Amino acid sequence: MVREEQEEDDNNNNNNGGGERKLLVADETVPSLLDETGLVCVTGGSGFVASWLIMRLLQRGYSVRATVRTNSEGNKKDISYLTELPFASERLQIFTADLNEPESFKPAIEGCKAVFHVAHPMDPNSNETEETVTKRTVQGLMGILKSCLDAKTVKRFFYTSSAVTVFYSGGNGGGGGEVDESVWSDVEVFRNQKEKRVSSSYVVSKMAAETAALEFGGKNGLEVVTLVIPLVVGPFISSSLPSSVFISLAMLFGNYKEKYLFDTYNMVHIDDVARAMIFLLEKPVAKGRYICSSVEMKIDEVFEFLSTKFPQFQLPSIDLNKYKVEKRMGLSSKKLKSAGFEFKYGAEEIFSGAIRSCQARGFL
């Protein structure tokens, strides 16, 4: 069997990720749980992470069913950046589904061997109540999980979690240490923290959803994998500016509002996120939480890095000490790396890829 994979070309990024294609001979473990068919489902297909994952899955040889929701007027979004991807005409199907109507995901899931649940029903800075957001998030998740069981073909379920589920853990590394998958945020620690950069609704809903997914998998014999990710940065094929890219480049955008500044920036390249998901899909055994974070930089290091590597933006000299920033701890990806995964991108690729995409779309 031959599979075709596209490597990112950091010198010539385009709307489809850029780069030259090379043929790879699939090893015997690819894909172990997908021997009969390479059909997978990706929810929230129009988003930053999901769209890049879809691109990589198609390049890897999988057939993909992507779900998207309609806009506020009930019309489908412009998803030409998905439908025009290489191999999309042969192996990509688009389904309309909404987390407010969990049963709407059933047609997309039927017959799939794996489901990547990337969709989340809110923005991290939303002002909706915790109860409203958490109820909608968990109900949507549970509906999708039940559809996975009903399909009788889904072997592995992936939930895209967030580093907010481990950042606010008080004594368990809350003093600026490093945390791993054994740590869970304490909601009260988060609420008592003076400087916050996300809403309590986002923190509580992500924790509730990840916990519910893991518990559901344990009770029903479904392999559940959760990928705990920090700021995801790098190039993007989606049409809008991803919020995580904007936050990471806030200084270049001339935005020094404190809500966009952190004591420590934990980041990972978008392609490493997609690669990690596919890696865990293709492993014969994968279960539970995996932190996926590769770069950790202090705020002054980010400022110095951007000023030095990208002098054309002429960042102003400022006293960063005057800003009240949220303090965050380090993240350990030891479990993921011990499983055999290798991160491919560092800080320079993370920032340069994001900047090129922003420039190509007129955001910078």
Curated annotation (Swiss-Prot):
GO terms for cellular component: cytoplasm. Residues 1-11 have a biased composition (Acidic residues). Its EC number is 1.1.1.-. The keyword Disulfide bond does not apply. The keyword Oxidoreductase applies. It comes from the Eukaryota. The active site is at K206. Pfam families: Epimerase (PF01370). NADP(+) binds at G44, G45, S46, G47, F48, V49, R69, D98, L99, Y202, K206, V232, S244. GO terms for biological process: brassinosteroid biosynthetic process; brassinosteroid metabolic process; regulation of brassinosteroid biosynthetic process; response to absence of light. Mainly present in cell elongating-containing tissues. Strongly expressed in roots and flowers, also observed in petioles, stems, leaves and siliques. Pathway: Plant hormone biosynthesis; brassinosteroid biosynthesis. Keywords: Brassinosteroid biosynthesis, Cytoplasm, Developmental protein, Lipid biosynthesis, Lipid metabolism, NADP, Oxidoreductase, Steroid biosynthesis. PANTHER family: NAD DEPENDENT EPIMERASE/DEHYDRATASE, PROTEIN BRI1-5 ENHANCED 1. The ben1-1D (bri1-5 enhanced 1-1dominant) activation-tagging mutant suppresses the bri1-5 weak mutant allele of the brassinosteroid receptor gene BRI1. Monomer. Belongs to the NAD(P)-dependent epimerase/dehydratase family. This is Protein BRI1-5 ENHANCED 1. The gene is BEN1.
